[in-house]
């Protein structure tokens, strides 16, 4: 029993040395199609990662959960939400922000259609 307590204490010390991202995903139901990036930021806070591919901007939020990290990806075109997805990742251990777009991540079909469109057919206003 003493050995188990010692192992737990030492493990806790090491876990305290690693940054862990704990974003709240509980407000995600408030994010709706057509919202602007500013409106989403007001609801969700700053994303852990953003990407821009052609005219699709993608924001990622994550929450470290033991054995299965939870993620939210929000997709914008012309500064407006067009899609959002939840996904999980359980294969790797560590801060969830390091494993964005892994696990069961899939680009939503409506976003993939935009990414697959010929470059000259994309409206860049």
Q: Predicted segment positions?
A:
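Residues within mature, well-folded domains
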Residues: 18-125
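C-terminal motif of bacterial Sec signal peptides marking the signal peptidase cleavage site
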Residues: 14-16
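Positively charged n-region of N-terminal signal peptides that target proteins for export
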Residues: 1-4
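Internal alpha-helical transmembrane segments of multi-pass membrane proteins, especially GPCRs
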Residues: 6-9
